[in-house]
C-alpha cells in the first residue's frame, strides 16, 4: 500500500517537537516493516500562502500552477493511506497544514464539480485517513472548542474520499502535564500503524 505521511510541525517547544518526530518516525518504521511504500512530506519549508495567481486559477481547468503543489497533489492521488502528523494550534490546524490543504487539495484533485454543480469525490483511492495530533490544551478544553483540526481532517477530508474510507485519530493532550505519557502514545501509534 502507498502511504503518504504529512508532517506539519508548528513553532512548538523542543519537547513537543521531539514527541511529534518520534510519532512520525515510529509510523514510518512500522509501516515500512509491514512492507508498505512510505513517502514523508515535511511541511516545515512549505509556503502555506495561497497567492493571487493560485486563487485566480482555483476553479480553472488547471488549478495547480505551482510545481511543488502539483508534486504533492500527485502523491496524494497515488496514496491509499494518508497519515497526518501535527501539533494543534489553538485547537485547529497549524498554518502550514491548513495552507497545504488549500493549495494541494484543489478542484480536480480532491473533488470536482460537474456541469450540474454537483460536487464529486476525487480521492477515491484512499482507504485510510489517520490523524496523529499533539494538543497543547486539555481533553475537556479541546472538546469544548469542538476540535476544528479533527473535524476538518476526519469529516471534511473524508467527504472527498470513498464512503468506505476508514478513519482513525490518535491524540495526546498536554504532554507536559503527564509523566511517562510519551512512550504510551508512541506505542499507540505503533499499534495503529501495524493495523493499516
Stretch-by-stretch model annotation:
Residues 140-144, 148-196:
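Glycine-rich phosphate/pyrophosphate-binding loop and the adjoining helix
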Residues 1-4, 126-131, 167:
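Hydrophobic beta-strand segments of well-ordered beta-sheets in folded domains
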Amino acid at each position: 500500500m502507498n502511504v503518504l505521511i504529512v508532517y506539519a510541525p508548528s513553532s512548538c517547544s523542543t519537547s513537543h517537537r521531539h514527541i511529534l518526530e518520534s510519532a512520525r518516525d515510529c509510523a514510518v518504521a512500522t509501516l515500512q516493516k509491514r512492507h508498505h511504500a512510505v513517502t514523508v512530506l515535511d511541511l516545515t519549508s512549505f509556503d502555506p500562502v495561497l497567492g493571487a495567481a493560485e486563487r485566480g486559477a482555483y476553479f480553472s481547468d488547471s488549478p495547480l500552477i505551482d510545481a511543488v503543489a502539483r508534486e504533492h497533489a500527485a502523491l496524494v492521488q497515488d496514496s491509499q493511506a494518508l497519515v497526518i502528523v501535527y501539533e494543534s494550534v489553538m485547537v485547529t490546524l497549524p498554518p502550514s497544514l491548513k495552507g497545504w490543504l488549500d493549495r494541494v487539495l484543489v478542484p480536480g484533485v480532491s473533488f470536482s464539480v460537474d456541469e450540474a454543480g454537483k460536487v464529486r469525490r476525487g480521492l477515491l483511492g484512499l482507504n485510510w485517513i489517520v490523524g496523529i495530533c499533539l494538543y497543547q490544551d486539555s481533553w475537556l478544553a479541546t472538546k469544548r472548542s469542538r476540535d476544528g483540526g479533527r473535524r476538518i481532517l476526519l469529516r471534511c477530508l473524508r467527504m472527498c474520499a470513498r464512503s468506505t474510507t476508514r478513519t482513525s485519530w490518535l491524540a495526546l493532550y498536554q504532554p507536559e502535564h503527564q509523566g511517562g505519557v510519551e512512550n504510551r502514545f508512541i506505542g499507540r501509534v505503533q499499534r495503529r500503524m501495524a493495523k493499516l
